[in-house]
Amino acid sequence: MKILITGASGFVASQIIPHLRASGAELVLISRDVAALRAHYPECASGDYDAWDSLAEGVDAVLHLAAKNNDADGGAETFHNVNVGLLRDVLRKTKKSGIAQLIFASSLHARPETASKSHYATSKMAAEKLLEDQCSLALRIYQLAAVYGTELAGNLAIVTKLPTPVRPALLKILGALRPTLQARRLADEILNAVNDPRSERKILTDQQRDNPAFTLCKRGMDLVFAATVGLLFWWLIAIVWLAVKLTSEGPGIFAQQRVGQHGKPFICYKFRTMKKDTKQAGTHELTNTSVTKIGKLLRKTKVDELPQIINLLKGDMSLIGPRPCLPTQIELIEARRSLGVLDVRPGISGLSQIRNIDMSTPKALAQSDAEYIALRSLPLELKIILATATGSGQGDKTRDT
């Protein structure tokens, strides 16, 4: 395996090159600072961009790391010249050299919700568009979170100012507040990509794995929410239960098996909004005549979800996460399984819900759920909670008759 890396004298390269070399990859390093390359990596072939043709022979993939980063000074033109103009030249050289694969290190800043906020973000979004329009190679676009390894840079560098014993804990806390990416995980992803050359766009983060700061805060929010609702709104729960019982035949609370974390089934509790003996199917598969009169109001106001505080207390669900589906929704289950969505607990509300993506489009829903997992942070959890509370997302819709 032979990988040509641009921007090889930069921070991200310095954190992943040891992992790539330890895995047996042969590296060709390119940078404007050739002296730094030869000083740090004397065992690797290296040169500047003018030496590309002589260095590119036998290369399997190009990893384009060269960029003007978001902590650098400069105007829009300066960022565009480096992050788009240089990429265009690298793409041309890659094609000319007959290299079959290009791996582009983009950024979470290039996502649509942030791309208008800085010259860096705008240039990274333009770079992705350039590749989508002009790259005919096997193309991997990786939107990276803040990368960390044996060293820290950017906003994470604040950790290095504290005593060594407390640094790991602070790094976990910062990771709970914004997505981060361990260098080893990035290196492993690159190695897998070179072994499997195909086109893909992917968000790369640690996904809050092994982050006790995020896990404890998220679980704490679940328990506080469940306890608050139970203590303050027990009377509303009792009134709604009685109203459902009196206005239609059937139980007040509907207990239904759903697919939970790791694909394990659990019983999900909701106020019944459907008529008795309605078939077990996704809401989008049912007609609106299946919904009771009071059920329409409960679904619109989301009050039907209140009994799910039981699931929060039991740990079956979280306040925020992918909405749990039925065991019969095989297409959605398999799509979620393939994207790792089943690795986390399902939620009462989620990113897909406030985006109005429901179970009628299983592949799109699974992809959106996977994006949520990659982007998870405490601020995002709070953003989804606020959006849900203010009326965003109305859940799965029934079919018109």
Label every PLM stretch briefly.
Residues I3-S23:
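N-terminal Rossmann NAD(P)H-binding glycine-rich loop of SDR-like oxidoreductase domains
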Residues E43-G85, D89, K93, H109-E113:
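NAD(P)H-binding glycine-rich loop region in Rossmannoid oxidoreductase-like domains
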Residues R88-T122, R140:
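Conserved Rossmann-fold NAD(P)-dependent oxidoreductase catalytic core, especially the SDR/UDP-sugar
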Residues E132-L152, S199:
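Conserved beta-loop-beta element that borders a ligand/cofactor-binding pocket
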Residues A145-R178:
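NAD(P)-dependent short-chain dehydrogenase/reductase
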Residues D210-K276, I384-T401:
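A hydrophobic, helix-centered structural microdomain
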Residues E285-V344:
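A short, structured surface patch at a secondary-structure boundary
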Residues V341-T401:
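C-terminal terminal-structure detector
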